[in-house]
Amino acid sequence: ICIVLLMILGIREQLAQKRNVKKIPIRVNINGIRGKSTVTRLITSILTEAGYKTVGKTTGTAARMIYWFQDDEDIIVRRPEGPNISEQLRVLQRAADLEAEALVCECMAVNPDYQKVFQFRMLEANIVVIVNVLEDHLDVMGPTLDQIAQAFGATIPYNGFLITIDCAYTNYFKQIAKERNTKVIIADNSKITDEYLAKFDYMIFPDNASLALAVGEALGIDEETCFKGMLNAHPDPGAMRITRIGDENLNCTFVNGFAANDPQSTVNIWERVKELEYNTEDPIVIMNCREDRVDRTEIFVSDVFPKIQTHTLVAIGEVSEPITTAFNNGQFPNVKNYINLEYAEPDKIMETLNPLL
């Protein structure tokens, strides 16, 4: 009896999902490693500006629902078991109940099999955006970049649009798209000026804006509307901000780059800060280490810290041993000082940092 009931519930859920998909003409799946939340917000704002009744959904620890009819966002309250891709069915139901014309969702799946379930059995997006292919979640998606690209490529839609950047895997993605009768649009960063990016009060990379602009192109939305719409997007809670701190005796700039969890994104942030002509001489670099992400710390040791001329490197959080060992072994000739504040409380961290500012 239990098996029969489960089968009936499964069929009902599948039928409801199909009905809800048919009610929402535009469905956008934002995939990739870094910047998905920001791109989701930019696209949601473009579609809203263009007059579509649009619902957006970001994921992660600060998951949000965004609605065309209100400025406030709804915080997604997770069930006790934590994030689960089944919540996407509830998002789909909510958007359909509101009679939304467009649904823009950040892919919340990391496991390659779950990514395919998210795309083909839940959202059924007719526009897929692959933001980038970077080294992260290697334990689940890797261990190589090729395997990460394969996971993203598997989510390319049939008879739809693929929006992505020009990268080492562009031709690979194009071949899959061709086999699936899907049109490819490559984001054009030349359309995004520094003057435009300076209008945001948080850091936006050219890729973020050009990808959103390309989605507008796929839907026939004029560029003026796209540019105007993006400026209306609220920043993600984890968005990177540059903040000046201090007083008449202290002029210090704090760059919140903790949202960047992979080497390339972190180095890109550093290069972008230099491009914007902030003072980057003798910086203090703070690395937040996590016990469940020791592999990430090790990657930063090999691929990030040697590339940044650093006055002081500070390790906080848990399991900073890879950094300590590398510094003691002379792997960071570019780092003048190293301070290990593993497991230190915030007050202790600030007490240590204040004399250095």
Task: Tell where the protein language model's regions lie, with residue ranges.
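Short, basic phosphate-binding NTP loop
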Residues: 1-31, 38-50
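ATP-dependent carboxylate-amine ligase catalytic core
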Residues: 18-24, 45-128, 132-149
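Active-site beta-alpha connecting loops in nucleotide-dependent enzymes
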Residues: 258-333, 338-342
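Short, charged/polar "capping" segments at the starts of alpha-helices
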Residues: 64-66, 113, 168-174, 292-296, ...
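Structural beta-sheet core signal
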Residues: 56, 128-130, 164, 284-287, ...
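Acidic, Mg2+-coordinating active-site environments of NTP-dependent enzymes
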Residues: 98, 125-246
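Short, conserved loop/helix-junction motifs that constitute active-site signature segments
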Residues: 119-125, 154-159, 276-280, 303-311, ...
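Beta-strand-turn-beta hairpins that frame and shape the catalytic cleft
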Residues: 245-254
